[in-house]
UniProtKB/Swiss-Prot annotation:
Name of the molecule in the record: Probable csgAB operon transcriptional regulatory protein
BP terms from Gene Ontology: regulation of DNA-templated transcription
Top-level division of the source organism's lineage: Bacteria
Every HTH luxR-type domain range: 149-214
Length: 216
């Protein structure tokens, strides 16, 4: 049973796709690269038991509308800190469709190779998300579902938004630390994490992004 499979990360990998030699090879590569355990499940078969902390890789290349609706409904009933990731996603898959996926934490497009998938999953295991900058902006500003469904990997935390708003008024790290009653090192850690989440390289870009995407 899949719920008996555990990993050192506290996570397990569930690849939902059409069984094939290629899918089996991909799963094996991911398991070896990430030192994580997991299982392949036939996308056309129902599945009720998804273990806590599971990372669900949904192969969009094998999903028609009926299957998408089934799996969205299935995953929406799970509240045990699972993370949903879309694999082989068409480049033109609408953002409004992506936000309908419960617990969505990342989107891998069909044009991305296996090493990008491995790199993205490494970030997921660290509690990050894997979105393009445009998609991240959309989810933050438009998607109430995303904010509700995401748990430990919320795209921007309340504290990160506080710090971004401090940056908008020109506050230094020291001033931010004093105003929020935290250390400068903690501020730097938050800045590092949020820069990665919104795909910017410096404070100026972060302020520009915040002005476009956050309310004061």
């Amino acid at each position: 049973m899949f719920n008996e499979v555990h990993s050192s990360h506290g996570h397990t990998l569930l690849l939902i796709t059409k069984p094939s030699l290629q899918a089996t090879a991909l799963l094996q590569h991911l398991k070896q690269s990430l030192a994580i355990t997991g299982k392949l499940h036939n996308i056309q078969r129902s599945l009720e038991d998804i273990s806590a902390g599971c990372i669900v890789l949904m192969d969009m290349m094998e999903a028609d509308k009926k299957l998408i609706h089934y799996w969205q409904d299935n995953l929406s009933r799970k509240n045990n800190n699972i993370k949903t990731l879309l694999l082989n996603t068409p480049d033109d898959y609408p953002y409004r469709e992506i936000e309908n996926w419960p617990h969505i934490n990342g989107v891998f497009y069909a044009t991305e190779d296996q090493e990008h998938v491995v790199s993205g999953l490494q970030g997921i295991l660290r509690g990050e998300c894997y979105f393009s900058q445009k998609l991240a902006s959309y989810l933050i500003t438009h998607s109430g579902n995303y904010r509700y469904n995401s748990t430990e990997s919320a795209l921007l935390t309340h504290r990160e938004k506080e710090i971004l708003n401090k940056l908008r008024i020109g506050a230094s790290n020291n001033e931010i630390a004093r105003s929020l009653f935290i250390s400068e090192n903690t501020v730097k850690t938050h800045l590092y994490n949020l820069f990665k989440k919104i795909a910017v390289k410096n404070r100026t870009q972060a302020v520009s992004w915040a002005n476009d995407n956050l309310r004061r």
